Amino acid sequence: MTGAESLVVEVEASRRILGDGFAGAVRFGELLAEHGEERGLIGPREVPRLWLRHIVNSAAVARWLPDAGSVADVGTGAGLPGVVLALMRPDLDVHLVEPMERRVAWLSELRDELDLDNVTLHQVQAQELHGKLKVQAVTARAVAPLGKLARWTLPLLSRRGVLLAQKGARAQAELDEAAVDLRDFAVDTASVHDVDLLGDGETTRVVEVRLR
């Protein structure tokens, strides 16, 4: 397969994965590639692999999102995965939770640029929303060890709500280590899923913690 053919396959696969959010995700990627490094959102080495590693990869949790309702993306940073999910699912109310002012300023500009009417910004730590916000799902990508993340996020979930955490190679080990923390909550199931978005054997691990 030539380089051009490979690119076509990659684009078509991305379009299939992102669905109606594809065009907005392309624009998001352009903005992040142009401004992300100077604004301290991504490192210089991330720019060449931004599209697949960060933008498309954000869709790994999409299949477990609720059919309706609201989602909170905790520690969203540059908007990953929250902005991508908001683009893919305009029917959901997406709450982007980020304590750093400069990142929230970026997210506010992004919301306007991408016409994300379904996005609400919260410049707080997740713990500050306990008792104030209830959602059907929480997403998190490279935020904290699972035990700590569970204590921050599970109080935000409504009944039968789900935490979807994108993790690395230690996903199962983190889940095992978090057993003590999870006992304090009404957890129904907790499992690790290997997600191969592009069908190329490269997997992303998603930890799913669902409440009763």
From Swiss-Prot:
Protein biosynthesis found in the keyword field: no
Uppermost EC category: transferase
Pfam family, one: GidB
Keywords, in A-Z order: Cytoplasm, Methyltransferase, rRNA processing, S-adenosyl-L-methionine, Transferase
E.C. designation(s): 2.1.1.-
Residues at which S-adenosyl-L-methionine binds: G75, L80, A126, Q127, R141
Matches recorded under InterPro entries: rRNA_ssu_MeTfrase_G (IPR003682), SAM-dependent_MTases_sf (IPR029063)
GO molecular function: rRNA (guanine-N7-)-methyltransferase activity
Highest taxon listed in the record's lineage: Bacteria
GO cellular component: cytosol
Subcellular location: Cytoplasm
PANTHER family given in the database record: S-ADENOSYL-L-METHIONINE-DEPENDENT METHYLTRANSFERASES SUPERFAMILY PROTEIN
Family: Belongs to the methyltransferase superfamily. RNA methyltransferase RsmG family.
Function per UniProt: Specifically methylates the N7 position of guanine in position 518 of 16S rRNA.
Protein name, UniProt field: Ribosomal RNA small subunit methyltransferase G
Origin species: Beutenbergia cavernae (strain ATCC BAA-8 / DSM 12333 / CCUG 43141 / JCM 11478 / NBRC 16432 / NCIMB 13614 / HKI 0122)
Lineage per the UniProt record: Bacteria, Bacillati, Actinomycetota, Actinomycetes, Micrococcales
